[in-house]
Amino acid sequence: MRKITYILIALVIFIFSGITLLLTTTGFKTNSFNSLINDKVNEVNPKLKLQLNDVNFKLGLKSFKFEVKTQNPKILINENEIDLESINFNINIFDYFNNKNPISRISIESKENSIDQLSNFINEYNFNLSRKLILKQIKKGNIKFNAEIFFDENEPNNLRYLLNGSVRETKVNLLNQLTFDNIKFDFLINKNFINLKNIDLIFDNIFITSDEISISKINREYEVTGNLKTKKTEININKYSAIINTNLDLLSDQSINLSSNNNLYFKINNKYKVEDFKIETKINFDELLTKSKFQDFIYLKNGDVFINYDKKKLDIALDSKFLFKNIKYNNSDSNNLFKAIYKKKKKFKCSSRY
C-alpha cells in the first residue's frame, strides 16, 4: 500500500513537473482569452476591434503570471485596419480569479504600414478636421512602431502610453507650395511630448538633417524646438525670403555654395497657426556676392554669416575675408578681413581690415 502511495505521489509530481515545464517553455495555444483581450482594447476606445489568431500562453514562475503573445493580429475600426506583428501582455492569475484587473500593460509591435493607411485609421478613430487637413499634406510614406499601453489598476479608463518607431520614404507637400521628399526619422511619443531624432529629408534639392526636434504640448498649444543642418550645397537664399516674410535685398541673386546650422523655435496655437517663430543660423560660405556698390571690384570669400531672426527683428552679422576681382590687388600675406552687421529697419554698418 505504501509502495502504491509513493508511486502515486511520484506520478503526481512527474505530471505537475511536466505541465510546469510545458507552461514555462513551449506554453499552449488557445482562443479562450480572446474576449478578455478585446475587452482591454475596448477600454482604450469602444470602436476598436482586434482580429486575433490563436494566443500563446507561457507561465512565468517568478511572477506567477501568464505571458501572453499573439502573432499577426489586426486592429480595426470599421473598414480601416492596422497590420500588427504581435501583441504581448501578462495576466496576473490571482487578480483574474479575484475579479480584478489582471492586465496592467500591453505591448504592441506593428508591421510596416503606409502612412495613408494610418491616417485613415486615426481619422476614423477620432475625427478632427484640422488634423485631417494636416495629414492630407502627407502624400506617401511608411511607418513602423512599438506601443506600450499602461492601465491604472484603480481607474481602468486612465491609461498612459509610450509610442516609438520610425517613418521612412515620406513625402510632404505643404499647401502645394513647399515639398519635402525622402523624409525619414525615428520618433518617441507620449501624451504631452513628441521627440523626433535622426531626421533626413530633401527640400528643393537641398539635403537637410537634424539630430533632434522636440514638440511639447502646453495647455492647448505646442512648442517646437530643434536643429536643422545642411551640407555644402548651391543655394539661392533670396529664393526663400518669402518663407520668413523678409526681403533679403542685400544679397545677389546668384547661388551660393554654403552649409548651415540652424536652431529654431516656434509655437503652434490651438488653431494650428505658427506663432513666435525664431531662428538662429550660422552659414559658412565659399563665396558671397552682394548688391552693394563694392560688388564690381571685390567679393567675399570663406566666411561665416550669423543670422538671428524673429517677428520683431532680423540681425545679420558677417565675418569674412574679401578679395579684389582684379587679382593684382590681392596680397597673399594680408588677412583682408571684412566684418558687417545688418539690422532690419536700421542702417547697414561695415568695417574691414587688410
Regions found by a protein language model. Give the residues of each.
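N-terminal Sec-pathway targeting helices
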Residues: 1-15
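A short alpha-helix capping/helix-coil boundary motif
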Residues: 15-19, 163-164
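Terminal hydrophobic membrane-targeting helix
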Residues: 18-120, 132-142, 146-156, 194, ...
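Extended amphipathic, helix-rich lipid-handling scaffolds
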Residues: 37, 41, 106-173, 185-194, ...
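Surface loops and adjacent helix of pleckstrin homology
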Residues: 78, 94, 177, 199, ...
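Well-ordered beta-strand positions in beta-sheet-rich domains
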Residues: 81, 86, 184-186, 212, ...
